[in-house]
Amino acid sequence: MSKLSEKKIIELFQSKLGNASFVPEDVELFKIGKEQLVVKVDTFVESTDLPPRMKLDDAARKSIVSCVSDFAAKGVRPIFGIVSLTIPKKFSRSSIQSLARGFQIAAREFSLKILGGDTNEGKELVITFSLFGTTKKIVTRSGAKTNHVIITSGPFGYTGAGLSILLKNKKSSKKFGTKAKTAVLKHMIQYFSLLRPPDSFVEDDRCFQQTCLP
């Protein structure tokens, strides 16, 4: 990314797209009938997000977890997902199957249905995942009031620190380093059970084989 801050980059797009301001939340939303459609998109890039020890199925799962965690923060249940893949030519059939397995695991874990997506060839692995859901009201950043209780699924900062340790060889204490690296390699979150329906499904893992495998 350029030397411009993320905020400045967004402002440049705002000026060209005619939006006075994007929704200042972790998700995008717009009204459809009596409900709001909630959308989240996140991109996983091999050179900046994939530590040497991370397995490809964990990488695929992580790309979905990044979106699901923002849905959880807004009190929204994920329903559908779409994935776009840029796959290096060097990837073997086994590597691509590992990616498909990671998507399948996450879809079942978070009770969402992956509808399909797009595949391309490139120099490195890039996963862009879009998540969709509906709600009547989200938990906004501006909604916090005095005496409200804030609940998190774990401590903050371990994933970012772990990436710095694994990708940039940053130094840390052994205890902290172990926790940080584990946070990256496992990328586990505890999702609110009240947001999850009793059934768990993925459309059909054959769709990955048909679109991704030679």
Where would I find each of the regions flagged by the language model?
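Helix-biased detector of long, well-ordered alpha-helical tracts
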Residues: 1-214
